[in-house]
Amino acid sequence: MKNILFRINELSKKEKATGLTVDEKQEQQMLRQNYTETFRGSLDSILLNTKIVDQNGLNVTPAALQDAQIRLKLSK
């Protein structure tokens, strides 16, 4: 993941400085898409394993999140 982000930043700097070739532009788009998909997958994983509790210790996790968590457990 760090390598992908490093390369994205490297291409971005080059784009601002001198521009990118067609191949580099395609690589940049592919890397950005890959990074975004990976990031979203990680975020989904974190959220699906999250429980929200108020000051009184009551579960206040939104219903939509609870439903998604139940579906995930049933699919395993």
UniProtKB/Swiss-Prot annotation:
The record's disulfide annotation reads none
Q: Which UniProt keywords apply?
A: Cytoplasm
Q: Where in the cell is it found?
A: Cytoplasm
Reply yes or no: does the keyword Cytoplasm apply: yes
Gene3D superfamilies tied to this protein: Helix hairpin bin (1.10.287.540)
Record-linked InterPro entries: DUF896
Q: Which GO terms describe its cellular component?
A: cytoplasm
Taxonomically, the superkingdom here is Bacteria
Q: Which family does it belong to?
A: Belongs to the UPF0291 family.
Q: What is the protein name given in its UniProt record?
A: UPF0291 protein BC_1827
